[in-house]
Design a protein with these regions (language model features):
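Short aromatic-cysteine micro-motif
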Residues: 78, 108-297
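Acidic glycine-/aspartate-rich tracts in secreted/extracellular proteins
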Residues: 88-92, 153-157, 209, 304-305
C-alpha cells in the first residue's frame, strides 16, 4: 500500500498536483492583475514595508512570495517573474556621485567581489558609451530605490529547443521553459532588453549586481561558504545527485553535445558525472531550487528604474 504504486503514494502525488494547480492559478490571476496597472504603484506588505512596483506588474498572490522579508516576487503582464534584491538605504546614504555609490556597494558586498571589475569590452552587446550610461543609471537607481529586480528564473523559451544559434524564439522568465542557449553575449543583451516592462530598463546583470545578490542571500541565512566555496547543496552541478520532480524536462549532455529533451520519469534522481561537458540540463521549475534559493533560480538579467 505504501510502495511506488500504493494508495498513500498516489494520495501524496494527488495532493502535490492539486497544490501545484492552485499555485499556477494564483500566478495566472497575478498576471491578469498586472495588466490593470497602467502606472507605477505602491505596495505595502503585512509588516508595513512599502515598495514601488513598476507598471504592468503585480505582487505574486502565492503565499510566501508577497513580503519583502521573505523575498518579494512580482509577475508582469507577460507572465515573467522578478525578485526584489534589497540594498539597505544606509549603504549609499552618504554617496552622491557614481563613483561614491559604486565604492559603497563594493564595500558592502566586498566578500563576493574578488578581484573582478565591471569593465566594458567589445562584443558585450553595448557600445562603450552606452555601457557607461547604463552603469550610471543602474547605480543611481539602486541608491534611489534601495535595490533592484532580477529575473527569478534563467531566461528560457517555450519554443522548441535548438542545437544552433536562433534568437527568433520568444524569451521568457518563467518556470518550465527550456534554457535559452546558443546565443552570443550581444544577442543575450538584446534578449534581456526585450524583457523590460512598465517603462523600466532591463539588461544583462552587471558584476556588482551579482555581488549584491550574493550579499542579499547571505542576509537571508545562506552561508558565505555555500555561496563562494561549495554550492553543491543547492546547485545543478555535474557531480551532484538530487531528486527531480515530475513535470520537468531534462536533456543529457555528452562531451558538450546536448541530447533530446524528455519528460522526467517518476522517482528520477539526477545522476553524477565525472567529466566536464557531461551532465543534465533541466527546465526551469521552482522545485529544482532545492533547499536554499527558494526565490531565485538562475540569475541572468535585472530590471531597474531608468529615471529614478
Amino acid at each position: 500500500m505504501t510502495g511506488e504504486n500504493g494508495i498513500l503514494t498516489r494520495a501524496n502525488d494527488a495532493k502535490a498536483n492539486t497544490e501545484q494547480a492552485e499555485e499556477d492559478e494564483l500566478r495566472k490571476l497575478t498576471q491578469a492583475e498586472a495588466a490593470t496597472y497602467l502606472e507605477e504603484h505602491e505596495y505595502t506588505d503585512v509588516s508595513g514595508e512599502t515598495i514601488t512596483i513598476p507598471a504592468k506588474c503585480a505582487v505574486s498572490q502565492v503565499e510566501g512570495e508577497n513580503t519583502l522579508a521573505g523575498g518579494l516576487v512580482i509577475i508582469d503582464a507577460n507572465g515573467n517573474e522578478w525578485v526584489w534584491i534589497e540594498v539597505p538605504e544606509s549603504i549609499t546614504a552618504s554617496s552622491t556621485t557614481d563613483e561614491d555609490i559604486k565604492n559603497a556597494l563594493i564595500s558592502y558586498a566586498t566578500n563576493y567581489r574578488s578581484d573582478y571589475s565591471d569593465t566594458w569590452y567589445e562584443g558585450c552587446g553595448l557600445e562603450e558609451q552606452e555601457y557607461a550610461d547604463r552603469y550610471s543609471e543602474m547605480l543611481q537607481s539602486i541608491k534611489a530605490n534601495n535595490g533592484f529586480f532580477v529575473g527569478r528564473y534563467e531566461v528560457g523559451s517555450f519554443d522548441n529547443p535548438v542545437t544552433g544559434n536562433d534568437i527568433t524564439r520568444k524569451a521568457v522568465i518563467q518556470k518550465g521553459a527550456y534554457p535559452y542557449n546558443w546565443v552570443t553575449c550581444s544577442q543575450a543583451e538584446d534578449l534581456a532588453e526585450g524583457l523590460a516592462t512598465g517603462g523600466k530598463t532591463s539588461t544583462l546583470m552587471f558584476g556588482i549586481q551579482w555581488d549584491l545578490v550574493m550579499k542579499y542571500l547571505e542576509t537571508k541565512g545562506v552561508s558565505e561558504s555555500e555561496l563562494k566555496t561549495n554550492s553543491g547543496s543547492w546547485g545543478n552541478y555535474r557531480d551532484v545527485e538530487f531528486q527531480v520532480e515530475q513535470g520537468n524536462k531534462y536533456a543529457i549532455s555528452t562531451n558538450w553535445r546536448l541530447g533530446e529533451w524528455n519528460d522526467i520519469p517518476a522517482n528520477y534522481t539526477k545522476p553524477t558525472f565525472n567529466t566536464d561537458g557531461d551532465g543534465v540540463l533541466l527546465t526551469t521549475r521552482k522545485e529544482l531550487i532545492l533547499n536554499l534559493l527558494k526565490k531565485l533560480y538562475l540569475l541572468s538579467i535585472k530590471m531597474y528604474n531608468q529615471s529614478p
